[in-house]
Amino acid sequence: MDENDHDESRVALVSGGSRGIGAAVTTALTQRGCRVGCTYRTGRDDAEKIAADAPEQVLPIRFDLHDDTTAPTAVADLVSHWGHLDSLILNAGQWSGGRLVETDADAWWSVIETNLRGTVALARAALPHLVHGRSPSIVLVSSVVGVIGHAGDTAYAGAKSAMIGFGRSLAKEVARDGIRVNVLAPGFVTTDMTDAVPDSARRRIERETVLGRFGTVDEIAKAAVFLSEDATFCTGSVLTVDGGWAL
């Protein structure tokens, strides 16, 4: 199928789309009538469960953040299946905390590479297809800690801050191609990742958050869909959705 032979449905690719925020984004997009490539690395069963709920709209695709050679294949699989690509939501990532002086150097750099390498590789692979998309857009899911920093998160915050700089710079590069690039910076959200947060730290975060609670994946997904589908006059923006934690 030629990429100019678009049908009515928009096509999105969501990295890390089988769990947590990514799964909520995948579901929210299908509810909008989009068809979605939902990438996974180890969560194939999770991706297939999402696809079972919307078999005509969800395509599970394997993509390994640690191996950027899998990015072109992931994009090619989606375009081969549905003919074009309109939006890319770069959500896949990994958290690992710890004070800098107490963190092994290899482990520290692994967090940086895991969060950045696959993101950049997937964006690079998708751009030649996005230029043919309708109202094409890229959303990078960063973090509020990448905006203001957070003690004990130098690697994760460093990677997420780099995503913001990457996204804003890419927005300037591809604007002439009609591609919007925006960054979503969630605060603390209830996911498998934050289940590991100790109760004492959770209570402190809730006290620091103006709205007094962790966010939900559905709340973050709504913001991601807004940036991807509705924010047609936004590019290079950073949308913080953190319940007021950063105030």
Specify the residue positions occupied by each region the protein language model found.
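C-terminal substrate-recognition "lid" of short-chain dehydrogenase/reductases
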Residues: 213-241, 246
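Residue(s) in the substrate-gating loop at a strand-loop-helix junction
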Residues: 143
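Short, small/polar-rich loop/turn modules that mediate ligand/substrate recognition or access, typified
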Residues: 135, 175, 180, 234-236
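Conserved glycine-rich Rossmann-like NAD(P)H-binding loop of the short-chain dehydrogenase/reductase
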Residues: 32-48
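Alpha-helical segment proximal to the catalytic Tyr-Lys
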Residues: 128, 172-176
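Active-site helix of classical SDR
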Residues: 123, 159, 167
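Substrate-binding pocket helix/loop in short-chain dehydrogenase/reductase
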Residues: 99-100, 107-112, 194, 205
